[in-house]
Amino acid sequence: MAVSLLSPGLKTEFESHAQQELTHADRLASRIQQLGGVPIFNLKELAGKAAAVGNHPEQGTTLTEMVIENLMLERRQVEAYSALIREIEDKDLITREILLEILADTETHASELADFLKRSSDRR
């Protein structure tokens, strides 16, 4: 069955993803503090750091563009978390476990967004 990008399922999925992203941020901030660091909560500072490493998210003007942009960001996060996990190896098992759990959620988010886009395009 085809699914419209306007379907209630997409809204529910975005709400779920947003809640999970907040949980990820809280977990990472707590771990940074446990390790003696200071997490960054200022959005302008975060955006500046993201831009410094080549992340320049675009604001979509249509719902489809927004879903595509979100999917690209999720895929970039998968790459970033995977690289961190490889770098950490067995040096910090607690952080590694947190990152593995977040990676699994992020891979699921990407898969769900790709599925919504595919089903939406199949409908056309």
Question: At which residue positions do the language-model features occur?
Answer:
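Iron-associated oxidoreductase/ferritin-like identity signal
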Residues: 1-124
